[in-house]
Amino acid sequence: MGIHSTINLPEAYTDLDQTLNSADLILSDAVANATTLFHTPVVSSIKGKEVVSRVMVLREFNLANKMMRFHTDYRAAKIKHFTENNNVSVIGYDPDLKIQIKLQGKIRVHHDDGVTELAWKESNGRSKKCYSIKDGSTKEILEPSDYDIQDFEVEDGYENFAVLIFNFNTLEFLYLKSSGHRRAIHRWEDDLKSTWLVP
């Protein structure tokens, strides 16, 4: 379909199930496939009356459990945002696929528990190194090199490691095509309800 992905997607969407199945394939592939832009979706949250957005690496996607997993530094400002208001939107778009996927739901912060222990064990040394920096991300510094790590123990970074579990209740799928765009939304209330939308 696109130069960045080997997954097989429909050339046209005529059935609602196709849109949900394609979203599942795309996001499942994106967990390990860093060449697709869905590997780094935009996660938006609320800070007071402001919307705050950041790009994050997708670590896990599970459609059956309506779940996404992200990793972050527990000292980061976003932790407070998520704690005070856990309503979150996640959106990704890949121009090669001409597909946008938007999800809405709630996010939970895990720190120093079974969830973080398992995720930490599965993380590689390069990823763990990021959490060994003396200060958390977005802290003001005088020089650009003031955050550089010199001597550190990789495992010491665990105390700064946090896992974000995002449980979505809506998934919106948009496919752009000159012959006719297609947009669908899937909502999980008591049961799954799906419908087409005007693109």
Predicted regions and their residues:
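Short beta-strand or tight-loop elements
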Residues: H39, R54, N86, E159-A162, ...
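Structured loops at beta-to-helix junctions and adjacent beta-edge loops in soluble globular domains
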Residues: I46, D73, Y93, N167-N169
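Charged, gly/pro-rich active-site loop segments
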Residues: G2-T14, Q100-P199
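Residue-level detector of beta-strand face positions
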Residues: V42-S44, S89-I91, I165
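A short mixed-secondary-structure module that forms the rim of ligand-binding clefts
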Residues: R59-K98
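An N-terminal domain-cap segment
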Residues: I7-N65, R69, K80
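Short strand-connecting beta-turns/loops that link adjacent beta-strands
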Residues: G48, L63-A64, L97, S178-S179, ...
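A short, aromatic/hydrophobic, helix- or strand-capping loop or linear motif
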Residues: A34-T36, Y93-D94, S132-I133
